[in-house]
Amino acid sequence: MSEILELEAESRTEFGTGAARALRRAGRVPAIIYGAGKTPVSISLEEKEITKYYRKPAFISQLINLTIDKKKYKVLPKAVELHPVTDIVRHVDFVFLEEKTQKMEVPVVYEGKERALGVKRGGYFNIVKRRVTLLCDVNNIPRNVTIDVTNMPMATSLKSSKIELPKGCSFVTNKEFVLATIIGRRGAKTEAEGEQQAAEAGK
């Protein structure tokens, strides 16, 4: 489970382009929270603080305790708008956490891909899925899904049915899919390559 980030925000009562510009001039970022059947809440965040946390790994799957006017809400980042030149955060969408489970997208970390057996024998480790969508218990939301692929041989594919997910998590789909393949040497078409092509065609 990822650590819970504590953030403070202020309610926002003025809207529109002019109000957003005024907030940014004051060093704050407009944001909104919605979802879970609740009334959307418009807020603002301290620009330097939210930009600092955004630049850390896996922010988009970070569980946050957001304090607004002395009330705490459990939320997840949904979308982040950046300045096109400076990469400073300009707007954030958050979603309220569901009471029991939450659908979310998390990054996949392939540990040992440079040392995989198939790579050592001349194969190429090809990533088909960099992120996966999970259904998670709100008390066990992972920052990522980490998979050890050091023993993955040449001409094989890594399928969802073989992945051990963090406790309280499951894939949103029961249909098996390919996450990665080790492609053989050029000119030797493999079963894994065929599965990779089928997976890409089904995207």
From Swiss-Prot:
Matching Pfam families: Ribosomal_L25p (PF01386), Ribosomal_TL5_C (PF14693)
All disulfide bonds of the chain are none
Q: Which UniProt keywords apply?
A: Ribonucleoprotein, Ribosomal protein, RNA-binding, rRNA-binding
Q: Look up keyword Ribosomal protein and say if it applies.
A: yes
The cross-references to CDD domains, in alphabetical order and at most eight, read: Ribosomal_L25_TL5_CTC
Q: Name one GO cellular component term.
A: cytosolic large ribosomal subunit
Task: Name the Gene3D superfamilies for this protein.
Answer: Ribosomal protein L25, beta domain, Ribosomal Protein L25, Chain P
- Molecular function terms, GO-annotated: 5S rRNA binding; structural constituent of ribosome
One GO BP = translation
Q: PANTHER family, from UniProt?
A: RIBOSOMAL PROTEIN L25/GLN-TRNA SYNTHETASE, ANTI-CODON-BINDING DOMAIN-CONTAINING PROTEIN, RIBOSOMAL PROTEIN L25_GLN-TRNA SYNTHETASE, ANTI-CODON-BINDING DOMAIN-CONTAINING PROTEIN
What quaternary structure, including any partners, is listed in this protein's UniProt entry? Part of the 50S ribosomal subunit; part of the 5S rRNA/L5/L18/L25 subcomplex. Contacts the 5S rRNA. Binds to the 5S rRNA independently of L5 and L18.
- What's this chain's function? This is one of the proteins that binds to the 5S RNA in the ribosome where it forms part of the central protuberance.
- Which protein family is named in the record? Belongs to the bacterial ribosomal protein bL25 family. CTC subfamily.
What name goes with this protein?
Large ribosomal subunit protein bL25
